[in-house]
């Protein structure tokens, strides 16, 4: 099976690309980094350190790479059986025009066999979003063929892949042993690909929100509380018993929303929370707080990992004290190298916390919840 994967970074190589290669797919990475492309094509393999309770070194073999800005990527789309992405939400829109050109060329070449596209991004229904962007570039005359032949399959992905430490091998990547890749089986065209580690479901949103409200919420609360206390890594922060307790409580608050909304078993979800806390404390992962905390404006948006679970607590009349504290800590996030962090601090200086919070989150500036968060923001100074 031929797979084209957009994004040859650590997540692409260490997570999605690895699972596909392990399933005997012919994986071609598409990326803008010419040095990375040359290295992958020269060696056609790379090492993956899988770390956790059991450690192992895997070698991913028989891979290739092309420039995502060149003509060769179009040729790969013409013959691909599967297209996947791990480029980040901010870059996803930028590959839509390339994908549209490739699909047009595919149809012109007479290839009407099923093609499935899976965006493996930290965003809700990211593939559906990509589909709408692709349709903006694909001529209307091709839309009916596109609808019958191409499946845009939403997914939920979960694996911590920190930036690789400097070493002599630029292709080497370190990943945690845990991974989860859940796909919406109702959106595939043709047969579902058989990939160990890819789990089909007909209830994707339950798993999307479980991951967003637990892993992502816990991760970001750990980062922002850890930043306030001067820690550098997620592990350092989560080993602080005060922070660990607050992060657990925040995930319990968001978990109560999931139990109400989707009927998750409270005991099983409590065990899931404990598993995530253990993942944050993995001594073999050096996951920097500024990597997790970056782009605070995106992470404070209404549909993201802090405000969306908070809105759920308001919907169901549930407690939210520790989610509020996580949002308050986010407002304190400073990082001169992060344009969004700089913009956030400028908004706070210009508008004050209530109006700035309303601008960023969509919450009403005069609401009780904003007043409560501002009080926590002031108490953290």
UniProtKB/Swiss-Prot annotation:
Keyword check for Oxidoreductase: yes
Keywords: NAD, Oxidoreductase
EC numbers: 1.1.1.17
Catalysed reactions, as listed in the record: D-mannitol 1-phosphate + NAD(+) = beta-D-fructose 6-phosphate + NADH + H(+)
Gene Ontology biological process terms from the UniProt entry: mannitol catabolic process
UniProt xrefs under PROSITE patterns: MANNITOL_DHGENASE
Catalytic class of the enzyme: oxidoreductase
GO MF annotation list: mannitol-1-phosphate 5-dehydrogenase activity
Cellular component terms per the entry's GO annotation: cytosol
InterPro entries found in the cross-reference section: 6-PGluconate_DH-like_C_sf, 6PGD_dom2, Mannitol_1_phos_5_DH, Mannitol_DH, Mannitol_DH_C, Mannitol_DH_CS, Mannitol_DH_N, NAD(P)-bd_dom_sf
Record-listed NAD(+) binding positions: 3-14
Family per record: Belongs to the mannitol dehydrogenase family.
UniProt-recorded name of the protein: Mannitol-1-phosphate 5-dehydrogenase
Species in which this protein is naturally found: Aeromonas salmonicida (strain A449)
